[in-house]
Design a protein with these regions (language model features):
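A generic alpha-helix preference that emphasizes hydrophobic side chains
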Residues: 2-3, 268, 286
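Short helix-coil boundary/hinge micro-motifs
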Residues: 7-279
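Cysteine-rich micro-motifs
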Residues: 284-294
Length: 303
């Protein structure tokens, strides 16, 4: 019967296949800026965001719990209670992420809306019907009903993907934050100011044995899986070609942003007075963050 085609194993395989191929978000690169969710930022700005609300020490346990629950759910019979639990877990994880500046650029609130739409009572009933259908307990006489169930199964696949993506995103951000922290300290220590000095500090950093150890553990962090397409936009009546990049994971976007930032001479510096990190795009000789600059005429003192 029709039910035989849509076995649960196929559903699981689809989810796992989509994990590696789904484009999560797109970024448009324009000269020395990038745009994401219709907002523009200077290239390299993600490095500032992960240090601004220090993302190195996000507690991973809640994310680990979500990942385990998502895997369990994928391997057992679907039921309403589990779906409601799953929704609650994702929502609480999104609430934690919303406190970190880096996640605000991804319109994480929208993710919450999507999850709530995926787990309305009506949708949950359809998922349960789909479950009975895959076990051949549920015969379908009308093709419209089949279409409805297949559509519901695609929504459910997406709901699973969100669980997996969100639980791995936090690992990628923590990892990136520690890379940014190490490299920024190296640059400040080397007093790198010009693009050439930056390149030297960067080279030292990449060849550092500690960094090599990090790079060998988990997949090589500089391997980017992204799809690039040209987009034409009009600026003051003139057409310009920019590149739009679709990323299927967070790490590739973050690493790309960090490196492109250095290429453009955009980078973080630690204030000589208050030790806070600030982001530079033009101020080659600026040693103090803008707050401390107000106090530094004529001679800087710690405050």
């Amino acid at each position: 019967g029709l039910g035989d085609v849509y076995k649960r194993q196929d559903f699981k395989d689809n989810v796992l296949k989509k994990l590696n191929t789904t484009n999560l978000f797109s970024v448009t690169y324009r000269k020395d800026k990038f745009a994401i969710s219709d907002k523009e930022y200077p290239i390299g700005y993600t490095s500032f965001l992960v240090m601004d609300t220090d993302s190195r020490f996000i507690d991973e346990s809640i994310f680990e719990d979500l990942k385990n629950f998502t895997e369990e759910l994928l391997n057992k019979d679907f039921n309403r209670t589990d779906f409601l639990n799953y929704r609650a877990k994702i929502i609480s994880v999104i609430d934690v992420l919303s406190q970190y500046e880096i996640f605000k650029i991804f319109d994480i609130k929208k993710c919450k809306e999507i999850i709530n739409e995926f787990f309305t009572e009506e949708k949950i009933k359809l998922y349960e019907e789909y479950e009975r259908f895959t076990k051949n307990e549920y015969r379908i006489k009308i093709s419209e009903k089949l279409d409805e169930l297949v559509k519901a199964s695609v929504d459910l696949e997406t709901a699973f993907l969100i669980g997996f993506f969100i639980s791995s995103a936090v690992k990628e951000v923590k990892y990136y934050s520690s890379v940014v922290f190490q490299i920024t300290n190296k640059i400040v220590k080397n007093n790198a100011r010009t693009k050439a000095e930056l390149a030297e500090a960067f080279s030292n950093f990449i060849n550092d044995p500690y960094m090599n150890f990090i790079f060998d553990v988990n997949s090589h962090p500089f391997g980017t899986r992204a799809t690039i397409i040209p987009v034409v936009e009009s600026e003051n009546g003139t057409s310009k070609i920019y590149r739009k990049v679709y990323y299927n994971n967070l790490k590739d976007f973050l690493m790309t942003d960090l490196f492109e930032g250095y290429i453009h001479g955009h980078y973080l510096w630690r204030c000589d007075i208050c030790d806070r990190y600030f982001f530079m795009t033009t101020a080659r000789n600026q040693l103090y963050c803008s707050t401390c600059l107000l106090y530094t005429s004529p001679k800087p003192t710690r405050h």
